[in-house]
Regions:
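Short hydrophobic-acidic sequence motifs that mark active-site Asp/Glu residues
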Residues: 29-31, 112, 131
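Flexible, glycine-rich terminal cap/loop adjacent to redox cofactors
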Residues: 1-91
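Rhodanese-like catalytic fold shared by cysteine-dependent sulfurtransferases
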Residues: 58-110, 117-151, 155-193
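Histidine- and/or cysteine-centered catalytic micro-motif in compact active-site loops
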Residues: 1-2, 116-118
């Protein structure tokens, strides 16, 4: 998961990449790996305390952490990561990793939906993606096949989660969210070259 180290509207926000590891059956937190700059130590401390306390991913999404815009966001990256993992743990959202997606590209039963904004598409899209901004998704459902496996992505995963919810509420059953969005896809692509 990618999240800003502090409120996005405050100057100087930098992304951090968080990989949370939990038990599949219980959701108990087992570990974390965070790559970034400012605030990584704070987030590792929070997860270390959660591990010591035997907390689960569902506990993380309910945390109430102190914040000020220069140092954190109202929805701290650890809380957002807890929400993402909880959605997956409860079966509310299936995810797909960049490596898993790469293996499926070219499959005629796969439709890839990029819900980023047009100005973000200039930096490139994943080959074969159908580009529909999140704000226009409801009006463009007829461009998509609800019977195909559908992978939704955005820059980091938040908008694609909302896009997946819209699609699910409109009868799409086989939905997956690209973990880490186009940011993680870019990192994966670089690692393969």
């Amino acid at each position: 998961n990618f999240h800003g180290d502090h409120a996005g509207y405050y100057p100087g926000a930098e992304n951090m990449m968080i990989k949370l590891i939990s038990e599949k059956d219980s959701g108990r937190i087992l570990g974390v790996q965070i790559v970034g700059g400012n605030g990584v130590d704070k987030r590792v401390d929070v997860v270390a305390t959660a591990i010591y306390g035997g907390m689960t991913v569902e506990d993380l999404e309910s945390l109430d952490l102190a914040y000020a815009p220069p140092f954190g966001a109202a929805k701290d990256p650890i809380i957002m990561t807890g929400m993402n993992h909880s959605n997956s743990f409860r079966g509310e959202m299936d995810t797909i990793t960049p490596a898993e997606l790469a293996a499926k590209l070219g499959d005629s039963n796969l439709q890839l939906v990029d819900v980023r904004n047009p100005n973000e598409w200039k930096a490139g899209t994943i080959e074969g993606a159908i580009t529909i901004p999140l704000d226009d998704l409801r009006q463009n459902l007829d461009q998509l096949d609800p019977n195909k496996e559908t992978v939704v992505y955005c820059r980091s995963g938040q908008r694609s989660y909302f896009g997946s919810c819209i699609l699910r509420n409109n009868g799409f059953k086989n939905l997956r969210n690209l973990t880490g969005g186009s940011l993680s896809w870019g990192i994966y692509q670089k690692s393969q070259s």
